[in-house]
């Protein structure tokens, strides 16, 4: 028996060795979910799966570093070749590799929250809108919500229910602000943190050739703290249609 399986209970062992089938591990805090995930990756490497074919996504950078250290302790330097990181870091890498396909340059800037808010403030001021109604923080939050729901500016403007709700909230210009905000970001070769996931979805949706490339590369996807993952992140994973 592999040493990697030592100390695991029967259910944990089953989750580790059956790596060719999709698995969802549900258990309480402190029950060893992360240990199962790292053991599964280590076992896959031991069984001959190429590190380059594994994509491990985590909720935080700290979790990614800890997982890599654990796997390294079990199987050695092979762990360093695994594609592992947060959703934002992995998707930023994918976008930089394919930025031109969605109209950006590879060296695009990633806006911090303050950068985004300042741009929104500028747009509101240029349009002579009432800042008591169009509070920059509120507008920024609504733009983030739209992107989290995979709603682009064009789709938002074409959605009668959304624009009708804006009118009832007395912010009928929101769709135009959203559109202009995204236009300015692209003009400045910049994305905000929400764009890293939204634009990855757009890239994989609109470029089947690029999607196919990552389907072939990432043959195994493993997600830590799946319950905390945003819808658009899950959608990006599922769009690859490979082992999860």
Predicted regions and their residues:
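Conserved RecA-like helicase ATPase core segment
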Residues: 2-7, 33, 37, 43, ...
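N-terminal pre-P-loop "Q-motif" helix
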Residues: 4-20
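Walker A/P-loop
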Residues: 21-39
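A basic/glycine-biased coupling hinge at the interface between accessory DNA-binding modules
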Residues: 2, 20-21, 42-220, 228, ...
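Well-ordered alpha-helical segments embedded in enzymatic catalytic cores
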Residues: 11-14, 40, 199, 235-236
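Hydrophobic residues on short alpha-helical segments
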Residues: 16-17, 140, 237
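Small-residue (primarily alanine) positions within well-ordered alpha-helices
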Residues: 15, 27-29, 56, 63-64
């Amino acid at each position: 028996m592999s040493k990697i399986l030592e100390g695991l209970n029967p259910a944990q062992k089953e989750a580790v060795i059956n790596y060719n089938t999709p698995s969802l591990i549900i258990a309480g805090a402190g029950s060893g979910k992360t240990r199962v995930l790292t053991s599964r990756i280590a076992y896959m490497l031991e069984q001959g799966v190429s590190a380059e074919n594994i994509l491990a996504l985590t909720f935080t950078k700290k979790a990614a570093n800890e997982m890599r250290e654990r796997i390294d302790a079990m199987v050695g330097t092979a762990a360093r070749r695994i594609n592992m990181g947060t959703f934002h870091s992995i998707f930023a890498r994918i976008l930089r590799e394919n930025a031109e396909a969605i109209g950006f340059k590879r060296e695009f800037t990633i806006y911090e929250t303050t950068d985004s808010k300042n741009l929104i403030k500028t747009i509101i001021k240029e349009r002579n809108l009432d800042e008591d109604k169009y509070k920059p923080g509120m507008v920024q939050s609504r733009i983030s919500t739209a992107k989290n729901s995979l709603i682009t500016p064009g789709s938002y403007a074409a959605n009668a229910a959304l624009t009708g709700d804006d009118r009832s909230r007395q912010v009928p210009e929101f769709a135009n602000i959203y559109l202009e905000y995204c236009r300015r970001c692209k003009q400045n070769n910049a994305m905000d943190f929400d764009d890293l996931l939204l634009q990855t979805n757009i890239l994989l949706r609109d470029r089947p050739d690029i999607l196919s490339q990552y389907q072939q590369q990432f043959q195994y996807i493993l997600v830590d703290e799946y319950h905390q993952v945003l819808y658009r992140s899950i959608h990006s994973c599922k769009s690859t249609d490979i082992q999860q």
